[in-house]
């Protein structure tokens, strides 16, 4: 039964990822006053399927000097971790109801660094290695603020369990009292998933294509799937943390519809940002984090620690 549940989760994720690539190309197309893919199938709807067939039927090329096992393991690890992170997400019922769901997600997102590092190192190409090192530095740096913001939100909800956040937000979304955290969280998720304007790892002008420059066909498709699965997952996480949908146990479908709509809007805003903003310079990216976000998040975290203690002694006003 568990295997069926697992498949029922993985297959829709992969389908969502496939069509997210199409949505992205359409959104970018319309924002640049053109049509986007419109040849394969009606309105280009079969484009992701054509892409998948093309990628998985290509011969998987491998550089002669690369280390084989790591080179093949890296994309598999990337996709496995990307899919594993979905297990504790309440939609409204999680696949595995974990006691420390939030901690698990942080740990998994930290492990994702290894797949990038291995792929860059195993490719034995200087461009791939530079791209991988950039990606790792960026991911590790932005995880610091993500962890502090999560801690502040946890101080409001009072539990590491994700479904508790739904209960916390029955009366008011957490984006209302802690909107500065939500803004910084959104920008940090952009950086964490290596999306524009933080896609320095894929700087075509200077690094060809970043850490996956030597990959082609199937392994490249796995990296691609992992990246987009992470994007959707991060937006779902944002929805759970700051835009909690109302959950009525008698009609869980309503929660799912509400939740999916919010997540989709956030995902489209990711694509919107990509179409609108130019890429950051690397030093600006690091300064933004270490000199702006980190002091701010630490101060706000202290605020979230002290406020409940200060207001605990205030008698109820009703």
From Swiss-Prot:
Record's keyword terms, sorted: Electron transport, Membrane, Mitochondrion, Mitochondrion inner membrane, NAD, Respiratory chain, Translocase, Transmembrane, Transmembrane helix, Transport, Ubiquinone
Localization of this protein: Mitochondrion inner membrane
Regions that span the bilayer: 2-22, 68-88, 100-120, 146-166, 171-191, 222-242, 253-273, 293-313
Documented EC number(s): 7.1.1.2
Single annotated GO MF: NADH dehydrogenase (ubiquinone) activity
Gene Ontology biological process terms from the UniProt entry: mitochondrial electron transport, NADH to ubiquinone; mitochondrial respiratory chain complex I assembly
Nucleotidyltransferase recorded as keyword: no
Organism superkingdom: Eukaryota
Uppermost EC category: translocase
Protein's membrane topology: Multi-pass membrane protein
GO CC, alphabetical: mitochondrial inner membrane
Reaction equations catalysed: a ubiquinone + NADH + 5 H(+)(in) = a ubiquinol + NAD(+) + 4 H(+)(out)
Function of the protein: Core subunit of the mitochondrial membrane respiratory chain NADH dehydrogenase (Complex I) which catalyzes electron transfer from NADH through the respiratory chain, using ubiquinone as an electron acceptor. Essential for the catalytic activity and assembly of complex I.
Family label: Belongs to the complex I subunit 1 family.
Cited PANTHER family: NADH DEHYDROGENASE SUBUNIT 1, NADH-UBIQUINONE OXIDOREDUCTASE CHAIN 1
Subunit details: Core subunit of respiratory chain NADH dehydrogenase (Complex I) which is composed of 45 different subunits.
Name of the molecule in the record: NADH-ubiquinone oxidoreductase chain 1
Organism: Hipposideros armiger terasensis
């Amino acid at each position: 039964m568990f295997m069926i549940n697992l498949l029922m989760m993985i297959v829709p994720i992969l389908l969502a990822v496939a069509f997210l690539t199409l949505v992205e190309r359409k959104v970018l197309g319309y924002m640049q006053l053109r049509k986007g893919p419109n040849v394969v199938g009606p309105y280009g709807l079969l484009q992701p399927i054509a892409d998948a067939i093309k990628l998985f039927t290509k011969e998987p090329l491998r550089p002669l000097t690369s280390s084989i096992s790591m080179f093949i393991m890296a994309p598999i690890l990337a996709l496995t971790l990307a899919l594993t992170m979905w297990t504790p997400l309440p939609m409204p019922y999680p696949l595995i109801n974990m006691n420390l769901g939030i901690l698990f997600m942080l740990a998994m997102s930290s492990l994702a660094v290894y797949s990038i590092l291995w792929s860059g190192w195993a490719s034995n190409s200087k461009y791939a290695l530079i791209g991988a090192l950039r990606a790792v530095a960026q991911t590790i740096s932005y995880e610091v603020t993500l962890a502090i913001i999560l801690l502040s939100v946890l101080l409001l909800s009072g539990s590491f369990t994700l479904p508790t956040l739904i209960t916390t937000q029955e009366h008011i979304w957490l984006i209302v009292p802690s909107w500065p955290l939500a803004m910084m969280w959104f920008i940090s998720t952009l950086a964490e998933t290596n999306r524009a304007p933080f896609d320095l790892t894929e700087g075509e002008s200077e690094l060809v294509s970043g850490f996956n420059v030597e990959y082609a066909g199937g392994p490249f498709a796995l990296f691609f799937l992992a990246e987009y699965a992470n994007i959707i997952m991060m937006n779902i996480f944002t929805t759970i943390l700051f835009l909690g949908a109302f959950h009525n146990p008698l009609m869980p479908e309503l929660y799912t519809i509400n939740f999916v709509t919010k997540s989709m809007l956030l995902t489209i805003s990711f694509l919107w940002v990509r179409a609108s903003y130019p890429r950051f310079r690397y030093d600006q990216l690091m300064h933004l984090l270490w000199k702006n976000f980190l002091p701010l998040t630490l101060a706000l975290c202290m605020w979230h620690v002290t406020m409940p203690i200060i207001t605990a002694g205030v008698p109820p006003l009703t």
